[in-house]
């Protein structure tokens, strides 16, 4: 059995594995199914899967960024990881030039490091959904341990967000981490709200 630091929740390895696989399958499938309609603000009455995809998984920057964070954890270890270390990984591995990703990369290259990299020149995207849609990695690495998940979600979110965009990742990381062991929706919301 895995137990959190506080001893509030316990989760079996089998349950942990099942939830992590469900998380990543869901993220990959959702990203692939949604990609053809991303940035299309029209109502979509989708009745089919686009044949041009041919059953292949599409590139997904939301998932790719989490894999960069996983590599950072594997190489650096959790204790050494902070927003400055993530900024190094961002500069070396995140290639997306658009929106908050591009602003963050440019800021880091100019010496504007987190948390300022999420603020400076980022007025259009600092409150966007780019941070919270990549929060699953912290929950998967810290199941049933929202305090630990939120610590690294903070380091992640402040690279390219601030304000509501930043708080959204803290909220979802806490909720997702707690959801490894807690099933009561109101309790999950209470846990997540306590972090913002």
Predicted regions: what they are:
Residues 1-196:
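Structured, active/binding-site neighborhoods that engage oxygen-rich ligands
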